[in-house]
Swiss-Prot record:
Domain Myosin motor: residue ranges: 84-789
Entry-annotated residues carrying N6,N6,N6-trimethyllysine: K128
Protein name (database record): Myosin-11
Organism: Gallus gallus
Alphabetical list of InterPro entries matching this protein: IQ_motif_EF-hand-BS (IPR000048), Kinesin_motor_dom_sf (IPR036961), Myosin_head_motor_dom-like (IPR001609), Myosin_N (IPR004009), Myosin_S1_N (IPR008989), Myosin_tail (IPR002928), P-loop_NTPase (IPR027417), XRCC4-like_C (IPR014751)
Quaternary structure and interacting proteins, as annotated: Muscle myosin is a hexameric protein that consists of 2 heavy chain subunits (MHC), 2 alkali light chain subunits (MLC) and 2 regulatory light chain subunits (MLC-2).
Membrane-spanning ranges: none
Start and end residues of each stretch annotated as Rodlike tail (S2 and LMM domains): 850-1979
Domain of life: Eukaryota
Location(s), subcellular: Cytoplasm, Myofibril
Gene: MYH11
Region of interest called Disordered, as start-end residue ranges on this chain: 1130-1150, 1709-1736, 1891-1979
Pfam families: Myosin_head (PF00063), Myosin_N (PF02736), Myosin_tail_1 (PF01576)
Residues that coordinate or bind ATP: G177, E178, S179, G180, A181, G182, K183, T184
C-alpha cells in the first residue's frame, strides 16, 4: 500500500518510505558493486569496482566516470539502499566512516537533524527554524518508547525522565560539541519538554503573574522556562562561530518528587568570560544585555540610566554588530517579561540595568599621562560623574581611589600615585568584577525563585550546557578552561561508553574480549591539571603567581622546560612571540597566547574602590559588594558563593585561591555529580563554519565524528549488550510472558530467568546471563516490552469482560429482585383495593391503633428520660472541651516561645559553626599551602641537584665527543691531503705518459726510417737511386692514401656527428609525438569511457523500455479483455434495461389506470381542489428533479469529454514513444552493421601494418648489430646508446600502457555494437580519421624505407673505413700495452685510496639498505595493520549481519507459524462460510415452500371470497324481496347502515394489513434473491481476482527466469569476450615489440605527424560538438526513461488499488451475509404474524357473512347513483381515447429513447477505455457524487415518508368512498372484470420481478465506478420517458373524473401494492447500487 502522506512537521521527523524502498536504487547497487573511496571534496565518493589486482583495486567514480586505482585498505563498503537515512546507525550492515557520513548527510539534506548512534544521539545544526518543537510533537513523544518514534531531543528527554522514575536513579543529559553546534538550543528544548510532561498543575495553568510567595498554577514550570532567557541575556554573546554562544557553563538540576512532578530546580554556573565585557574580537559582540538595553530602552529609561548610542561606548569595541533574524529591542522586552515571571521586582530590574549602564560608562573614563611624570590624571570626569551617579558613590572619593589609592606599607598607610596603565587596568578590573557580581546575583535570585517549593525532591535530572570546544585566532585563558572542560567531558563519555561497559561485562562473567579503542584523553588532561612531577599548566600558572617578578613569558618558558617533551605539548612555530604554546586536544591543535594569564588567574581588584562601593547609597550596589574578602590582591567571594548557592556543597574556601584552582575544584565537583548519575549523551555537530543552512562540510563533520568517538560508540553498541536488567526485576516485569514456565515454590532468580528465556524462545546470540543481571543486545528489551504491552492489553480486556459480565449479572439480579418486589407491591395494592371497602377491614384498622396507645405512652416516657441524660452528658463534654482548648492555646504559646528561642540559638550556633569551619578551613588551607611550598622547594632542590649532575655528565660527554670529532677531522684532512696528492700524481703521470707516447711515436718513426736507409745502403749501393725512386713513389702513394684516409675519416666523423644530431633531433621529436599520441589516446579513452557509460545507460533504458512495453502490452491485453467483457455486460444490461423499461411502462400504465379510478371516485366526492394542489406539488417536484438530472447529465458529459481527451492524448503519446523506440532500434541495427564492417577493415589494416613492421624490424636488427660494433669501440657512443635504451624503455612502458588502453578499447568496442545511432555517426568520423592516420603511417613507412636504403649505402662506406681503422688500431695496440703497464702501477698506487673509499661506501650502503628495510617493514606493518583493521571491521560487520540474519530467520519462522495459523483460520472461516451458505440456501428453500403454500392459501381465500360474494348477491336479492313485502322493517335501516360501515372499515383495515404483509413477504423474497445474486457475484469476482493474481505471479516468475537466462547468456558472452581480449592482448604484445623496432624510423615522420596533430585537434573539436549532441540525446533518453518509470509507478499504484478493491469486496460480502441473516429473521417474524392475521381474517369473514344479510336493505338507495355512474363511463371512454393517443406519442418517445441508448452504449464503450487511466484522478468527483448520493438518499427517504402520509390519506379517503361504493348496483360485474385484470397484472408483476432480479444479478458484477456512471446514464435516458408518463398520468386523472366503479377496494389495494412494490423495488435497487458504490469507493 502507498504510504500515508506526511504533514509539514512530520516531514522533518519521519523518513519517506517510498525513497528508501526504491527497487531501482537496489538494483543499481547490486549491479555496480558500489563502494566508498576517499575524496578531497566530499570526504568520500561513491564508485563501482571494475578490476581487482592483488591488494589494488581499479574503481570508476560515479560522479564523473573517472577511473582510479587504489589500495584495498582505502576502500570502504557501501550499505544497500534500504539502509538510506536509517534512524539508528547501529543498524547499518557496513559500519565505517563513509557510511556514517553518508547517512548523516542524507538525513541532514532531508531536514532530519537527529540521528541515533547506538546509545546516544547525534544532532547537526540546521541553521534554520524547523517545525518540530510544537505541543503537537511533544504529545507525540510523551510516554513513547525510543523505537516507536523517530530520533528527537524529546525522545532523549523522555527516556531519561522515564528511567529516573522507573529505576529511581538520577539522570543527566550532556549536550556536547563545538561552539555553534546547537547545545544551548537543545538544552532549552529539553527543559521545555520536561516542563510540559512533568508539570504538577496540568490542565490548571494560570497566566497571571504573582509576585508574592504563593504560587499560581504552573508558575514553577513557567519560571523554569523563563530562567534561560535571563541567563542568555547576561551570559551569552555573538562569536565568529555562533550568534548565541554561551560564554559560561551551566548545570541545570531539576528536582522531581516520587510521583514525577517538578518540585524545584537549581542552576550552577562555571567560568563566566567576564573579559568580554571590556574587549571583543573583530565581528564579535559583548554580552547581549548591553545591546538589548541600548536598543530597547524607553526615552525615560534612557534619561534615568544615562544611556548613549552604540558608538559612544569604548567597551563596545565593534559598535553595533546586528545578529541576523533578531531584533535587540524585542529581545529586551522578552528579557524584562522573563524577569517579571521569575519574580524580580521593578526596583530590582532598574537596579540591574543601572549596573549594566555603569559598566558601559566605566569604559568611557579616559586617563592621560602628565608631562613631567608618569602619573595618570583625569582631565574630563564627565564619565566618572555618570558612573558615580549610577552607583551611588562620591565622585571625588572614586577618582582619588583610582588615581591615588591608599596602600598599606608595613604598618603605615600611604597614598600611591598610579600610572596611566595602572589606572586603565583598575577600571577594566572594576568593570569585569562588577558584571561578574551582577551575574552571580541574578543566578542566586533565579535559584531562589526556582527552589521555593516545600515539597521534597526524590531524584533529579541534570542538564549540562557548557561552552563547546573553541579554536579562535587568539586563544586565551578562558579558551584553555573551556577546552579543558570539554576534554574532561569527552573522557567521561569514553570512560562510560567503552571502559565501564566492558568492565561490567568482565565483572558479570560474560565472555568478552576487551577492546582498546585508543580514545584515552588522560595525557592531555594531566598536561593541564597535574599538580607535580612534572606540574601541569594550571599548577605552573599558580606557581608563577607567587613570584613578584614573574611574567607571562617566564611562565611559558617554565612550561616549555617542564612539559617540552610531552606528547600533547608543542612549542609555537612563531619565534617572535614568546608567550605562545600549543596543546594537542582531542578536537585539534590549539595555539594559546599566554598574555595577561597571571593577571587573569589572580584577578586583582582595587581595595579602595571596593570599600567605596560597599558603602554605596544604592542598597542594591551595597549588597553586591558587602561580602568582599580580599587577601594579597586575589579576589575572593567565599561568603557570597556560600550564601548564594544553598544547595551546593561548601567547598574549600580561603586565602590565595586563584581562578584556576577555583575552576578546577568546580569542575571536579561537576564530574563527581555526573559520575553519580546515569548520563545520556547528545553529540552536537556543526556542519559548516559559514552558518549557512543546507551546507555540510564533509571533512569538518568527519573530524568531529572521529573526535567524538561516534564510530566506536556504535561498534560497541552493536557488538556488546547495552541493555541490562537485574534478575529479580526481569522476572517481576516479564513473567507475564512466560506464565507457566516457572514452577511454583521458591526458585533462584538466575534459574528463573533462564527458564523464562527458554520459554520466550530468544536467540542465544541476543542475550548473555551474568552473575546478577541479564544482558541484551539492542532492540531485544524493546521487543519484550511490546509483547508485554500486548499481553497486558489482552489480560485487561479479559478482566474488563469479566467485570462487565459480573456487573451485568448483578444488575440483572437486581432487576429480578425489583421485578419480584414490584409484583409483591402490585399484589398487595390489588388486595388493598379489594379490602378497603370491606366493613370488617375498616373496623380492624380503627381498632388496632387503640391497642398500641398504652405501650406508646411508656415508650415516650423512656425516650424523654434518655434524652435528658444525653443532654447532661453533652453539657459535661462541652465544658471539658473548653478547658482542653484553653490548655492547648497555652501550650501552643509556650511551644512558639521555645521554638523562637531554639531558632535563635540554632542560628547563633550555625553562625558560630560557620565561622569556625571557615577559620579551620583557612588554617588548614594555609597549612596545606605551606606544606605544598615546602614540598615544592625540596623537589626543586632535588631537581636542581639532578640537573647539575646531568649537566656535568653532559659536559663530560661533550668533551669526549669534541675529542672524537677532532680526531675524525684530522683523519679526514689527512685522507683529503693524500687524495689531493694522489690526484696530482695521477695527472702528472698521465701528462708524462702522453709526452712519452708522442716521443715514442717519433722515435719509432725515426728508427724505421733509419733501419730502412741502413738496409738499403748496406744491401745494394748500386741500386740506391732506383730504390730511392721506388721509395719516393711508394712514399707519395702512401701519403696520398693517408691523406685520402684522413679525408674519409673526417667525412665519416662529420657524417657520424650529423647522424647523431639527426638521431637526437628525431628522438626529441619522437618523444613529443609520443606525448601527443598519449594525450590523444587518453582523450580517445575518455571518449570511449563516456561512450561505454552511455551504452550502459542506453542498455538500461532499453531494458526498462522493453519491460515497460511488455507491461503495456499486458495492460492493453487486460484492457481489451475487460472491454469485451464490459461490452457483453453492457449488451446484457441494455437488454435487461429494455425489459425493465417495458415492465415499468406496463406497471406505470396500471398505476395510471388505478390513479384514474381514484380521481374519478374523488371527483364524485368533490375532491378536485385537493387533487389539483397535490398535482401542482408533484409538478414542482418533477421540474426540480428534471433540472437536477439535466445538470448532472451536463456535468457527466463534460467529465466524459475531458476523460476522452486525456485518454486520446495518453494514447498518442504512447504511440509516439513506440515509434521513436522503433526508429532508435532501426538506427541501432544500421550502426551495428556499419561498425562490424569498419572493424573488419581495421583488422585487415592492422595485419598489413604488422607485416610491414616485421620487415622493418629485421632491417633494424641488422643495423643495430652493426651500430653496436661501432659503439662498443667508442665510449661516447656507449653513453648515447644507454640513454637511448632508457628512452626506449620508457617508450615501451608507454606502449604497454597504450596497448592496455587498446585492449580496454577493444573490449569496449565489442560492446559498442549495441549502441545508439547518434554515437554511430561519431564512430564513423573516428574511423575516417583512423584511416587517414593509417595512410599517413604508410607514407611514413615508405619514407623510412628510403632512409634505410640511404643508411645501407652509408654502411658500406663505413665498412671500408672500418677496415682501414683496424690497420691503424694494430699500430695503436703496441702503444696501449705500454700504457697498460703504467696504468697498472697507477692502479696499485690508487688501490689503497679506493679500498678506504669502498669501505666507507660499503658502510653507507649497508646503512641505507638497513634504513630501507626498516622503512619497508614499517610500511608493510602499517599495511598489515590497515588490512587487520579492515578485516576486523568486516568481521564485526559479518558477525552483526549473522546475528541479524539469525534474528530474521527466527522472525521468519515465527511468521511462518503465524501464517500457517492464519491459513488454518482462513480455511475454518471459509468452511464456516460454506456451511452458512448451505444453511442459508436450505432456509431459502424452506421459505420458498412456505411462500408457495401461502400463495395457495391466498388463492383459496380469494375463491372463498368469490363464493361469499355470490352468496351475498343471492342474499341481496332475497332482501329486496323482503323489502318490497315488508315496509315496517325500514325503520332500523339507518342503525344497520352504521354498524355495517364500521364493520366494513374494520374489514378494509384488516385487508390492507394483509396486503402489506404480503408485500413484506415479497420484499423479503426479493432481498433473498438479491443476496444470493450478490453472493454469486462476489464469489465469481473473488475467484477471478485469485486467478488474476496467480497469473501475475506466474508472469513475474517467467520474467525472473527470463532475466536470469539473459544474465547467464550475458555472463557467457562476457567470458568469451575476456578470452578473446586475452588473445588479442598477447597478439598486441607481440605487435608492440615489433613497433618498438620502428620507433627510431618513425621519428623521421615528425613534421607530417605535427600536421596530422593539427588535423586531429580540429577533428577533436568536431568530436566535442558530437559529444555534446550525444549528451543532449542521452538527456532526452533519460527524460523518456523517467516518464516510463512514472508510468510504471502509476501502474503499480493501480495494482495496489485493485488489491484494496478486493479487500473491500470481501468486506461487502461479510456485510451482505449480515443483511441476509437479518432478512431471514424478519421473514420468520412476518410468517408468524401472517398466520395470526389469517386466523383473524377467517373470523372477520364469518362476521361479513352475517352483515351481508343486512346489505340487501340498502339496494333502494342505489338507483340514485346509477345516473352518475353512466356519466362516469362516458368520461372514461373519452379518457381511453386520449390514452391511446398518448400511448402513440409514448411509442415515439420509446424509439427516441432506444436511439439515445445506442448512443450511450457507444459512449460507455469509450468511457470504459478511459476508466483505467482516469481512475486515480476521479477521486474528488467520486466524493462529490457520494455527497450527491447521500442528498438523493435523504430526498428518497423524505419522499418515502411523504408516500406513507399519502397512503394514510388514501386509506381515509377509501373509508369515505365505501358508502358510495355500497350503493352501486353494477359493482359485482366490474369487480369480476377488474379481478381478471388484477390477476393478469399480478402475473406481469411476477415476470417483471424475475426480470428485475436477473438484471440486478448481472448489474452487481460491474465494479463500483462503472455502476455509478451507468446509473447516471440510465437516469439521463429515462428522464424523457418519465416526463411523458407524468403528463399522461396527469391527463388521465383529469379525464377520468366520473367513471363508475363496481369493486374498488381490492383493485385499489392491489394497485397500491403494485405501486408500493414498484417503489420498494426501485428503492432496493438504489440501495443495492449505493451499497455497491460505497463499497467500491471505500476500496
Amino acid at each position: 500500500m502507498s504510504q500515508k502522506p506526511l504533514s509539514d512537521d512530520e516531514k522533518f521527523l519521519f523518513v519517506d518510505k517510498n525513497f528508501v524502498n526504491n527497487p531501482l536504487a537496489q538494483a543499481d547497487w547490486s549491479a555496480k558493486k558500489l563502494v566508498w573511496v576517499p575524496s578531497e571534496k566530499h570526504g568520500f565518493e561513491a564508485a563501482s569496482i571494475k578490476e581487482e589486482k592483488g591488494d589494488e583495486v581499479t574503481v570508476e567514480l560515479q560522479e564523473n566516470g573517472k577511473k582510479v586505482t587504489l589500495s584495498k585498505d582505502d576502500i570502504q563498503k557501501m550499505n544497500p539502499p534500504k539502509f538510506s537515512k536509517v534512524e539508528d546507525m547501529a543498524e547499518l550492515t557496513c559500519l565505517n566512516e563513509a557510511s556514517v557520513l553518508h547517512n548523516l548527510r542524507e538525513r541532514y539534506f532531508s531536514g532530519l537533524i537527529y540521528t541515533y548512534s547506538g546509545l546516544f544521539c547525534v544532532v547537526i545544526n540546521p541553521y534554520k527554524q524547523l517545525p518540530i518543537y510544537s505541543e503537537k510533537i511533544i504529545d507525540m513523544y510523551k510516554g513513547k518508547k525510543r523505537h516507536e518514534m523517530p530520533p528527537h531531543i524529546y525522545a532523549i528527554a523522555d527516556t531519561a525522565y522515564r528511567s529516573m522514575l522507573q529505576d529511581r536513579e538520577d539522570q543527566s543529559i550532556l549536550c556536547t560539541g563545538e561552539s555553534g553546534a546547537g547545545k544551548t538550543e537543545n538544552t532549552k528544548k529539553v527543559i521545555q519538554y520536561l516542563a510540559v510532561v512533568a508539570s504538577s498543575h496540568k490542565g490548571k495553568k494560570d497566566t497571571s503573574i504573582t509576585q508574592g510567595p504563593s504560587f499560581s498554577y504552573g508558575e514553577l514550570e513557567k519560571q523554569l522556562l523563563q530562567a534561560n532567557p535571563i541567563l542568555e541575556a547576561f551570559g551569552n554573546a555573538k562569536t565568529v562561530k555562533n550568534d548565541n554562544s554561551s560564554r559560561f557553563g551551566k548545570f541545570i538540576r531539576i528536582n522531581f518528587d516520587v510521583t514525577g512532578y517538578i518540585v524545584g530546580a537549581n542552576i550552577e554556573t562555571y567560568l563566566l568570560e567576564k573579559s568580554r565585557a571590556i574587549r571583543q574580537a573583530k565581528d564579535e559582540r559583548t554580552f547581549h544585555i548591553f545591546y538589548y538595553l541600548i536598543a530597547g530602552a524607553s526615552e525615560q529609561m534612557r534619561n534615568d540610566l544615562l544611556l548613549e548610542g552604540f558608538n559612544n561606548y569604548t567597551f563596545l569595541s565593534n559598535g553595533h554588530v546586528p545578529i541576523p533574524a533578531q531584533q535587540d529591542d524585542e529581545m529586551f522586552q522578552e528579557t524584562l517579561e522573563a524577569m517579571t515571571i521569575m519574580g524580580f521586582t521593578e526596583e530590582e530590574q532598574t537596579s540591574i540595568l543601572r549596573v549594566v549602564s555603569s559598566v558601559l560608562q566605566l569604559g568611557n573614563i579616559v586617563f592621560k599621562k602628565e608631562r613631567n611624570t608618569d602619573q595618570a590624571s583625569m582631565p574630563d570626569n564627565t564619565a566618572a560623574q555618570k558612573v558615580c551617579h549610577l552607583m551611588g558613590i562620591n565622585v571625588t572619593d572614586f577618582t582619588r581611589s583610582i588615581l591615588t589609592p591608599r596602600i598599606k606599607v608595613g604598618r603605615d598607610v600611604v597614598q600611591k600615585a598610579q600610572t596611566k596603565e595602572q589606572a586603565d587596568f583598575a577600571i577594566e578590573a572594576l568593570a569585569k568584577a562588577k558584571f561578574e557580581r551582577l551575574f552571580r546575583w541574578i543566578l542566586t535570585r533565579v535559584n531562589k525563585a526556582l527552589d521555593k517549593t516545600k515539597r521534597q525532591g526524590a531524584s533529579f535530572l541534570g542538564i549540562l550546557d557548557i561552552a563547546g570546544f573553541e579554536i579562535f585566532e587568539i586563544n586565551s585563558f578562558e579558551q584553555l578552561c573551556i577546552n579543558y572542560t570539554n576534554e574532561k567531558l569527552q573522557q567521561l563519555f569514553n570512560h562510560t561508553m567503552f571502559i565501564l561497559e566492558q568492565e561490567e561485562y568482565q565483572r558479570e562473567g560474560i565472555e568478552w574480549n576487551f577492546i582498546d579503542f585508543g580514545l584515552d584523553l588522560q595525557p592531555c588532561i594531566e598536561l593541564i591539571e597535574r599538580p607535580t612531577n612534572p606540574p601541569g599548566v594550571l599548577a605552573l600558572l599558580d606557581e608563577e603567581c607567587w613570584f613578584p617578578k614573574a611574567t607571562d613569558t617566564s611562565f611559558v618558558e617554565k612550561l616549555i622546560q617542564e612539559q617540552g617533551n610531552h606528547a600533547k605539548f608543542q612549542k609555537s612555530k612563531q619565534l617572535k612571540d614568546k608567550t605562545e604554546f600549543c596543546i594537542l586536544h582531542y578536537a585539534g591543535k590549539v595555539t594559546y597566547n599566554a598574555s595577561a594569564w597571571l593577571t587573569k588567574n589572580m584577578d586583582p581588584l582595587n581595595d579602595n574602590v571596593t570599600s567605596l562601593l560597599n558603602q554605596s547609597s544604592d542598597k542594591f550596589v551595597a549588597d553586591l559588594w558587602k561580602d568582599v574578602d580580599r587577601i594579597v590582591g586575589l579576589d575572593q567571594m567565599a561568603k557570597m558563593t556560600e550564601s548564594s548557592l544553598p544547595s551546593a556543597s561548601k567547598t574549600k574556601k580561603g586565602m590565595f585561591r586563584t581562578v584556576g584552582q577555583l575552576y578546577k575544584e568546580q569542575l571536579t565537583k561537576l564530574m563527581t555529580t555526573l559520575r553519580n548519575t546515569n548520563p545520556n549523551f547528545v553529540r552536537c555537530i556543526i556542519p559548516n563554519h559559514e552558518k549557512r543552512a543546507g551546507k555540510l562540510d564533509a571533512h569538518l563533520v568527519l573530524e568531529q565524528l572521529r573526535c567524538n568517538g561516534v564510530l566506536e560508540g556504535i561498534r560497541i553498541c552493536r557488538q556488546g549488550f547495552p541493555n541490562r536488567i537485574v534478575f529479580q526485576e526481569f522476572r517481576q516485569r516479564y513473567e507475564i510472558l512466560a506464565a507457566n514456565a516457572i514452577p511454583k515454590g521458591f526458585m533462584d532468580g538466575k534459574q528463573a530467568c533462564i527458564l523464562m528465556i527458554k520459554a520466550l524462545e530468544l536467540d542465544p546470540n541476543l542475550y548473555r546471563i551474568g552473575q546478577s543481571k541479564i544482558f541484551f543486545r539492542t532492540g531485544v528489551l524493546a521487543h519484550l516490552e511490546e509483547e508485554r504491552d500486548l499481553k497486558i492489553t489482552d489480560v485487561i480486556i479479559a478482566f474488563q469482560a469479566q467485570c462487565r459480565g459480573y456487573l451485568a449479572r448483578k444488575a440483572f439480579a437486581k432487576r429480578q429482585q425489583q421485578l419480584t418486589a414490584m409484583k409483591v407491591i402490585q399484589r398487595n395494592c390489588a388486595a388493598y383495593l379489594k379490602l378497603r371497602n370491606w366493613q370488617w377491614w375498616r373496623l380492624f384498622t380503627k381498632v388496632k391503633p387503640l391497642l398500641q396507645v398504652t405501650r406508646q405512652e411508656e415508650e415516650m416516657q423512656a425516650k424523654d428520660e434518655e434524652l435528658q441524660r444525653t443532654k447532661e452528658r453533652q453539657q459535661k463534654a462541652e465544658a471539658e472541651l473548653k478547658e482542653l482548648e484553653q490548655k492547648h492555646t497555652q501550650l501552643c504559646e509556650e511551644k512558639n516561645l521555645l521554638q523562637e528561642k531554639l531558632q535563635a540559638e540554632t542560628e547563633l550556633y550555625a553562625e558560630a559553626e560557620e565561622m569556625r569551619v571557615r577559620l579551620a578551613a583557612k588554617k588548614q588551607e594555609l597549612e596545606e599551602i605551606l606544606h605544598e611550598m615546602e614540598a615544592r622547594i625540596e623537589e626543586e632542590e632535588e631537581r636542581s641537584q639532578q640537573l647539575q649532575a646531568e649537566k656535568k655528565k653532559m659536559q663530560q660527554q661533550m668533551l669526549d665527543l669534541e675529542e672524537q670529532l677532532e680526531e675524525e677531522e684530522a683523519a679526514r684532512q689527512k685522507l683529503q691531503l693524500e687524495k689531493v696528492t694522489a690526484d696530482g700524481k695521477i695527472k702528472k703521470m698521465e701528462d708524462d705518459i702522453l709526452i712519452m707516447e708522442d716521443q715514442n711515436n717519433k722515435l719509432t718513426k725515426e728508427r724505421k726510417l733509419l733501419e730502412e736507409r741502413v738496409s738499403d745502403l748496406t744491401t745494394n749501393l748500386a741500386e740506391e737511386e732506383e730504390k730511392a725512386k721506388n721509395l719516393t713513389k711508394l712514399k707519395n702513394k702512401h701519403e696520398s692514401m693517408i691523406s685520402e684516409l684522413e679525408v674519409r675519416l673526417k667525412k665519416e666523423e662529420k657524417s657520424r656527428q650529423e647522424l647523431e644530431k639527426i638521431k637526437r633531433k628525431l628522438e626529441g621529436e619522437s618523444s613529443d609525438l609520443h606525448e601527443q599520441i598519449a594525450e590523444l589516446q587518453a582523450q580517445i579513452a575518455e571518449l570511449k569511457a563516456q561512450l561505454a557509460k552511455k551504452e550502459e545507460e542506453l542498455q538500461a533504458a532499453l531494458a526498462r523500455l522493453e519491460d515497460e512495453t511488455s507491461q503495456k502490452n499486458n495492460a492493453l491485453k487486460k484492457i481489451r479483455e475487460l472491454e469485451s467483457h464490459i461490452s457483453d455486460l453492457q449488451e446484457d444490461l441494455e437488454s435487461e434495461k429494455a425489459a425493465r423499461n417495458k415492465a415499468e411502462k406496463q406497471k406505470r400504465d396500471l398505476s395510471e389506470e388505478l390513479e384514474a379510478l381514484k380521481t374519478e371516485l374523488e371527483d364524485t366526492l368533490d375532491t378536485t381542489a385537493t387533487q389539483q394542489e397535490l398535482r401542482a406539488k408533484r409538478e414542482q417536484e418533477v421540474t426540480v428533479l428534471k433540472r437536477a438530472l439535466e445538470e448532472e447529465t451536463r456535468t457527466h458529459e463534460a467529465q466524459v469529454q475531458e476523460m476522452r481527451q486525456k485518454h486520446t492524448q495518453a494514447v498518442e503519446e504512447l504511440t509516439e514513444q513506440l515509434e521513436q523506440f522503433k526508429r532508435a532500434k532501426a538506427n541501432l541495427d544500421k550502426t551495428k552493421q556499419t561498425l562490424e564492417k569498419d572493424n573488419a577493415d581495421l583488422a585487415n589494416e592492422i595485419r598489413s601494418l604488422s607485416q610491414a613492421k616485421q620487415d622493418v624490424e629485421h632491417k633494424k636488427k641488422k643495423l643495430e648489430v652493426q651500430l653496436q660494433d661501432l659503439q662498443s669501440k667508442y665510449s661516447d657512443g656507449e653513453r648515447v646508446r644507454t640513454e637511448l635504451n632508457e628512452k626506449v624503455h620508457k617508450l615501451q612502458i608507454e606502449v604497454e600502457n597504450v596497448t592496455s588502453l587498446l585492449n580496454e578499447a577493444e573490449s569496449k568496442n565489442i560492446k559498442l555494437t549495441k549502441d545508439v545511432a547518434t554515437l554511430g555517426s561519431q564512430l564513423q568520423d573516428t574511423q575516417e580519421l583512423l584511416q587517414e592516420e593509417t595512410r599517413q603511417k604508410l607514407n611514413v613507412t615508405t619514407k623510412l624505407r628510403q632512409l634505410e636504403d640511404d643508411k645501407n649505402s652509408l654502411q658500406e662506406q663505413l665498412d671500408e673505413e672500418v677496415e682501414a681503422k683496424q690497420n691503424l688500431e694494430r699500430h695503436i695496440s703496441t702503444l696501449t700495452i705500454q700504457l697498460s703497464d703504467s696504468k697498472k702501477k697507477l692502479q696499485e698506487f690508487t688501490a689503497t685510496v679506493e679500498t678506504m673509499e669502498e669501505g666507507k661506501k660499503k658502510l653507507q650502503r649497508e646503512i641505507e639498505s638497513l634504513t630501507q628495510q626498516f622503512e619497508e617493514k614499517a610500511a608493510s606493518y602499517d599495511k598489515l595493520e590497515k588490512t587487520k583493521n579492515r578485516l576486523q571491521q568486516e568481521l564485526d560487520d559479518l558477525v552483526v549481519d549473522l546475528d541479524n540474519q539469525r534474528q530474521l530467520v527466527s522472525n521468519l519462522e515465527k511468521k511462518q507459524k503465524k501464517f500457517d495459523q492464519m491459513l488454518a483460520e482462513e480455511k475454518n472461516i471459509s468452511s464456516k462460510y460454506a456451511d452458512e451458505r448451505d444453511r442459508a440456501e436450505a432456509e431459502a428453500r424452506e421459505k420458498e415452500t412456505k411462500a408457495l403454500s401461502l400463495a395457495r392459501a391466498l388463492e383459496e381465500a380469494l375463491e372463498a371470497k368469490e363464493e361469499l360474494e355470490r352468496t351475498n348477491k343471492m342474499l341481496k336479492a332475497e332482501m329486496e324481496d323482503l323489502v318490497s313485502s315488508k315496509d315496517d322493517v325500514g325503520k332500523n335501516v339507518h342503525e344497520l347502515e352504521k354498524s355495517k360501515r364500521t364493520l366494513e372499515q374494520q374489514v378494509e383495515e384488516m385487508k390492507t394489513q394483509l396486503e402489506e404483509l404480503e408485500d413484506e413477504l415479497q420484499a423479503a423474497e426479493d432481498a433473498k434473491l438479491r443476496l444470493e445474486v450478490n453472493m454469486q457475484a462476489m464469489k465469481s469476482q473473488f475467484e477471478r481476482d485469485l486467478q488474476a493474481r496467480d497469473e501475475q505471479n506466474e508472469e513475474k516468475r517467467r520474467q525472473l527466469l527470463k532475466q536470469l537466462h539473459e544474465h547467464e547468456t550475458e555472463l557467457e558472452d562476457e567470458r568469451k569476450q575476456r578470452a578473446l581480449a586475452a588473445a588479442a592482448k598477447k597478439k598486441l604484445e607481440v605487435d608492440v615489440k615489433d613497433l618498438e623496432s620502428q620507433v627510431d624510423s618513425a621519428n623521421k615522420a615528425r613534421e607530417e605527424a605535427i600536421k596530422q596533430l593539427r588535423k586531429l585537434q580540429a577533428q577533436m573539436k568536431d568530436y566535442q560538438r558530437d559529444l555534446d549532441d550525444a549528451r543532449a540525446a542521452r538527456e532526452e533518453i533519460f527524460a523518456t526513461a523517467r516518464e516510463n518509470e512514472k508510468k510504471a509507478k502509476n501502474l503499480e499504484a493501480e495494482l495496489i488499488q485493485l488489491q484494496e478493491d478486493l479487500a473491500a469486496a470481501e468486506r461487502a460480502r461479510k456485510q451482505a451475509d449480515l443483511e441476509k441473516e437479518e432478512m431471514a429473521e424478519e421473514l420468520a417474524s412476518a410468517n408468524s404474524g401472517r398466520t395470526s392475521l389469517q386466523d383473524e381474517k377467517r373470523r372477520l369473514e364469518a362476521r361479513i357473512a352475517q352483515l351481508e344479510e343486512e346489505l340487501d336493505e340498502e339496494h333502494s338507495n342505489i338507483e340514485t347513483m346509477s345516473d352518475r355512474m353512466r356519466k362516469a363511463v362516458q368520461q372514461a371512454e373519452q379518457l381511453n381515447n386520449e390514452l391511446a393517443t398518448e400511448r402513440a406519442t409514448a411509442q415515439k418517445n420509446e424509439n427516441a429513447r432506444q436511439q439515445l441508448e445506442r448512443q450511450n452504449k457507444e459512449l460507455r464503450s469509450k468511457l470504459q477505455e478511459m476508466e483505467g487511466a482516469v481512475k486515480s484522478k476521479f477521486k474528488s468527483t467520486i466524493a462529490a457524487l457520494e455527497a450527491k448520493i447521500a442528498s438523493l438518499e435523504e430526498q428518497l427517504e423524505q419522499e418515502a415518508r411523504e408516500k406513507q402520509a399519502a397512503a394514510k390519506t388514501l386509506r381515509q379517503k377509501d373509508k369515505k368512498l365505501k358508502d358510495a361504493l355500497l350503493q352501486v348496483e353494477d359493482e359485482r360485474k366490474q369487480a369480476e372484470q377488474y379481478k381478471d385484470q388484477a390477476e393478469k397484472g399480478n402475473l406481469r408483476l411476477k415476470q417483471l420481478k424475475r426480470q428485475l432480479e436477473e438484471a440486478e444479478e448481472e448489474s452487481q458484477r460491474i465494479n463500483a465506478n462503472r455502476r455509478k456512471l451507468q446509473r447516471e446514464l440510465d437516469e439521463a435516458t429515462e428522464s424523457n420517458d418519465a416526463l411523458g408518463r407524468e403528463v399522461a398520468a396527469l391527463k388521465s386523472k383529469l379525464r377520468r373524473g366520473n367513471e363508475p366503479v363496481s369493486f374498488a377496494p381490492p383493485r385499489r389495494s392491489g394497485g397500491r401494492r403494485v405501486i408500493e412494490n414498484a417503489t420498494d423495488g426501485g428503492e432496493e435497487e438504489i440501495d443495492g447500487r449505493d451499497g455497491d458504490f460505497n463499497g467500491k469507493a471505500s476500496e
